Regions:
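C-terminal auxiliary extensions adjacent to catalytic cores
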Residues: 393-450
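Predominantly flavin-linked oxidoreductase catalytic cores and closely associated redox partners
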Residues: 36, 120, 124-290, 348
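N-terminal Rossmann-like FAD-binding beta1-loop-alpha1 element of flavoenzymes
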Residues: 11-41
C-alpha cells in the first residue's frame, strides 16, 4: 500500500461550486464573530475554481445579499436583466406570450457566468481564511465504522492518485493522493456527485424519498454583435421537444455575447433520444436561427440538472456529514434557478456545523439542525411551491403546462388537487426498441460546422483535456450486458445520450450467437456532465473523477 500524506481540518467542503464556497465563507464569518479559529478547506476537482462551473444562468442575488450584507456584489455578477420574454415555439414559428408569469419575472436578477461567480466567491473565501485547493478530486469517502456499518461515520476524503497508468501500474511520476480528515465533511459535488452517491446508498439517506430525476442542459456561447441588448432574457417551450420534458433559453450576457442552451429531461421514453441533436435542431428553428447566423460559436458545455424537487431531496445530514447544493437537489425547476438555493444550503449547513463544533458534537442528531434551518427558511418555502412541477410533465407537455398553472394557483398542489405527485427514476421510463413505433424515430441533423456541430467539434470548444494514458474514469461493470442485451433491447443508448461522443458501441449480434465487437470508451472527450451515470437503463455505468485538474475548462460559462 502506498504511503499517503494525511492532513486534518475542522471542516472539509468537497466541490468548489457556489454551495461549498458560500458555506465555507459563512463558517469563517461565524468563527470570526465568536473570536475563534477554524481550519476550513474547499477542494475542487477542476484545475482552477470555475473550470467546471456550468449553469444558464440568471442569478437571484438573494443569497449573495444575505452572505455579504451591505457589501458590493457586482464582482460576482455580470449583467442586470433588462427584459424578459417567453416564446412558445411551433414547428415553423413562435408565439410570444403576452406576459411573463410572475415566477419567471427576472427584474432585479442578473445574467451571469457561474464560472466567473465561483472564481469571485473563491477569492472572497480565501480572504476569509478558507484554504481553497483546486485539482484535488475527492476519490472516496473515509469512514469510521467502529460503531457498526449501519451507523458508520464519515471522517474524511481520500484524494485521487496521480501518475497511474491505464493498466493500473504506477508511472515514474506516481503520487498517491493524501487523506484529508475532518470533523465534518460537506459534499457539494454538483449533481450526481460520486461521493454523494456512495453516502446516500450506504447510509440510506434516500429512504422514504422520491427518486431523484434529472435533465441535461447543453449550451453554447456565441459571439454575435448587435442581435440582442445586454441583459435580454428569453425562455422557450415547445419545438423541438414535443415528447420530452425540457425547454430552451437565450440570454444576452453582453451586447455581443449570447448564451443559448436547451434542457432535455433525462426521463424520456425513446432510447434513441439525443440531447445534443435536440440542441442542434433547436438552433435551426426559424425563430432561433436568425439570432445566431453569421456569428461565431466560442464555447460549449453540458451538465446534469436535478429536477426532482422537494420530495426527491435526500436526508442531507449524517454523522460527520452534510450535503449541499445540487448534490442535495437544491434547485427550483419552475423558476429555472438553483444558484441562490445552493448558496443558501451551504450557509444553512455552515450554521448548523458551527453550532455542532462549538458543542463538540458532530453527530447526526446535532447536524439535524441543518434540516430544521431549511424547514424554517425561504428556500423551503420556494421549493415547496414548486414540489410537483417536473412530475406534471410525466403526462406530456400539455399536461405539464396545465399542472404548472394550476400549481401556481394552489400553492404547488399537483394539478391543483394532489399534495404530492409520484416520481420515478428517469432511466426506468426508457422503452425498449420493440415498443417504439416508426413515427417516433427522429431524423438527425447533419452538422454544417457553422450553425450546427458534431459532438467532437463541440467538445473541442469545451476545453476538455484528459491524460489518455490513465485508467478510464467511466466504469462499465459488465460490457457483456452492453453486447448481449442492450444492443438488442435498447440499441446502445449511450451513443445517443452522451453529449461528448464518449461511447462508441461496435457490436454485431446475430440470432442466438454470442455478440462480437467491443464498447469503445473515448473518456478523453468527457465533459463531466454525469448523463451516462444517470440514464444508462441497466445502471452499470459509474462515473468517477479522473486525475486531478482535468476535464472541461468552462471559461465564461
Amino acid at each position: 500500500m502506498p504511503q499517503r500524506d494525511a492532513l486534518e481540518v475542522d471542516v472539509l467542503f468537497v466541490g468548489g461550486g457556489p454551495a461549498s464556497l458560500a458555506g465555507a465563507i459563512r463558517l469563517q464569518q461565524l468563527a470570526k464573530a465568536a473570536s475563534t479559529e477554524l481550519a476550513v478547506m474547499v477542494i475542487e476537482k477542476g484545475g482552477e475554481i470555475g473550470n467546471h462551473g456550468f449553469s444558464g444562468a440568471v442569478v437571484d442575488p438573494k443569497a449573495l445579499h444575505e452572505l455579504f450584507p451591505g457589501e458590493e456584489i457586482a464582482g460576482g455578477l455580470d449583467t442586470p436583466v433588462t427584459s424578459d420574454a417567453m416564446w412558445f415555439l411551433t414547428n415553423g414559428g413562435k408565439i410570444k406570450a403576452p406576459f411573463v408569469p410572475p415566477v419567471l419575472n427576472n427584474h432585479g436578477k442578473y445574467v451571469a457566468s457561474l464560472s466567473n461567480l465561483t472564481k469571485w466567491l473563491a477569492a472572497k473565501a480565501e480572504e476569509a481564511g478558507v484554504d481553497v485547493f483546486p485539482a484535488f478530486p475527492g476519490q472516496e469517502l473515509l469512514w469510521d465504522a467502529s460503531t457498526g456499518s449501519a451507523q458508520a461515520r464519515v471522517v474524511g476524503v481520500r484524494i485521487g492518485d496521480k501518475g497511474v497508468a491505464r493498466d493500473g501500474s504506477h508511472k515514474s511520476n506516481y503520487e498517491p493522493g493524501p487523506d484529508l480528515t475532518a470533523k465534518v465533511v460537506v459534499l457539494g459535488e454538483g449533481p450526481r456527485g460520486t461521493l454523494t452517491k456512495t453516502a446516500i446508498a450506504r447510509l440510506g439517506l434516500d429512504a422514504g424519498r422520491d427518486p431523484q430525476v434529472y435533465a441535461v442542459g447543453i449550451k453554447e456561447l456565441w459571439k454575435v454583435p448587435g442581435r440582442l441588448a445586454a441583459g435580454s432574457v428569453i425562455h422557450t417551450l415547445g419545438a423541438p421537444l414535443w415528447n420530452t420534458f425540457g425547454g430552451g433559453w437565450i440570454y444576452a450576457m453582453s451586447d455581443d455575447v449570447i448564451d443559448i442552451g436547451l434542457v432535455t429531461g433525462l426521463d424520456y421514453a425513446d432510447p434513441t433520444t439525443d440531447p445534443h441533436d435536440n440542441f442542434q435542431r433547436y438552433k435551426l428553428h426559424p425563430a432561433i436561427r436568425p439570432l445566431l447566423e453569421g456569428g461565431e460559436m466560442i464555447r460549449y458545455g453540458a451538465k446534469a440538472i436535478p429536477e426532482g424537487g422537494l420530495h426527491a431531496m435526500p436526508r442531507f445530514y449524517a454523522d460527520g456529514l452534510c450535503i449541499v447544493g445540487d448534490s442535495a437537489g437544491f434547485l427550483n425547476g419552475l423558476r429555472l434557478k438553483g444558484i441562490h438555493l445552493a448558496m443558501k444550503s451551504g450557509m444553512m449547513a455552515a450554521e448548523a456545523i458551527f453550532d455542532a463544533l462549538q458543542a463538540e458534537d458532530t453527530s447526526s442528531a446535532k447536524l439535524a439542525a441543518y434540516e430544521q434551518k431549511f424547514q424554517d427558511s425561504w428556500a423551503r418555502t420556494e421549493l415547496h411551491a414548486a414540489r410537483n412541477f417536473h412530475q406534471g410533465f410525466g403526462s406530456g407537455i400539455w399536461g405539464g403546462l396545465i399542472n404548472a398553472q394550476l400549481s401556481l394557483m394552489t400553492g404547488g398542489r399537483g394539478f391543483g388537487i394532489k399534495d404530492k405527485l409520484a416520481g420515478e427514476y428517469g432511466h426506468e421510463r426508457m422503452k425498449k426498441l420493440s415498443e417504439l413505433t416508426p413515427t417516433q424515430v427522429t431524423k438527425r441533423v447533419v452538422p454544417d460546422g457553422k450553425l450546427t456541430f458534431d459532438k467532437v467539434s463541440d467538445v473541442f470548444k469545451s476545453g476538455t483535456m484528459h491524460d489518455e494514458s490513465q485508467p478510464a474514469h467511466l466504469h462499465v461493470s459488465d460490457t457483456n450486458i452492453c453486447a448481449e442485451r442492450c444492443t438488442v433491447e435498447y440499441g446502445n443508448p449511450c451513443q445517443y445520450f452522451c453529449p461528448a461522443a464518449v461511447y462508441e458501441p461496435h457490436f454485431t449480434k446475430t440470432g442466438s450467437a454470442p455478440a462480437e465487437g467491443k464498447l469503445q470508451i473515448n473518456f478523453a472527450n468527457c465533459v463531466h456532465c454525469k448523463t451516462c451515470d444517470i440514464m444508462d437503463p441497466y445502471q452499470i455505468i459509474t462515473w468517477v473523477p479522473p486525475q486531478g485538474g482535468e476535464g472541461p475548462v468552462y471559461t465564461g460559462m
